[in-house]
Amino acid sequence: SKGIAACPKHFAANSQELRRMANDSVVDERTFREIYTTGFEIAVKEGKAKSIMSSYNEVNGVYANENRHMLQEILVDEWGFDGYVVSDWGGSNDHALGVMNGSHLEMPGTGKSGMRDIVRAVKDGTLPEEVLDQRLDELLNVVFATHQATVDGKGKKFDVEGHHALARKAAEESVVLLKNSNNILPLKPGTKVAVIGDFAKTP
């Protein structure tokens, strides 16, 4: 009703941060169900979550974003999930296989190589076009259900500068000083500070 879709993450067995983009969570089915997916099951069945973010890691030798057992057999077939699966940032390893096995949206985008992989897979028959169409339909169902698109096709206008100002204000007001070594703060008037990096230009 508020135009928002919840997105629980990271599905699933993302149990450590060290080498999480490459590690393999080897886990038996009972442990996987009872420990690693119960929270997601509740979010889908009771919370009606419309989006799930897949994790970087492999689960029993298959990357989560391409894992049919997780994305189709458990998430859709058993739990009745009717939303879309989004990869973690750069978390798609095999673009076509991800689409084939239940992934919908790749972040931050497929890029040229990803698009070429998907087109090639459709042309050689490893990714049926109807599966690609189905993923698009499933994704658009959430877009329309959350009123993120308008019927007249004009789309919504966003106040980029206003949103930027709000984000900056939120960041400024949420800063917490944990340590003040040698009483360096507050800075004395006239003190020079070097701000380096992307956020120096656009805070």
Label the model's feature ranges.
Residues 1-203:
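Glycoside hydrolase catalytic-domain context in secreted enzymes
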